Amino acid sequence: MITTEKTTSRTAHLVELMTKGDDAFNNRNQATLDVIHHPDMIAYVTGNAQPIYGRDAHAKFMNQFVSMFPDAFVHTPYLIHFGTGDWITVITNVTGTFTGEMKLPDGKVVPPTGKKFDVEFAQTTKWKGDQLIEIAAFWDAAMLARQLGLA
């Protein structure tokens, strides 16, 4: 049974803010991200053993990601989006090329392979007013590793 539900104005507004944030990431516009991301945000990211606490720590993490994948790009409009209240989920693809060193937590460095990736990417977010306060970002890490020539 297929059901449809009208997008609420709150959900539509949050999807617009999320798009603005992903567009800012794509343009490497940290000032806009700082407006959208709450100072006390928490990020749960695939592959990280611990959550990332705070806007500044999240920005540092994203800068490390971009140093590995300088052309990383979150595609909009989203393939799927839905939400309720202060929560939304968006699903899209993220693409990029592994051209920068990958620094592992144990200090090892993985040299770039020059290989491209294209993986489905989901983000579930909670908003406090017009600021993102919590995010869980998901992708298939095994598929990403295979595409990068690491598995």
Regions found by a protein language model. Name each.
Residues 2-151:
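C-terminal and inter-domain tail/linker signature
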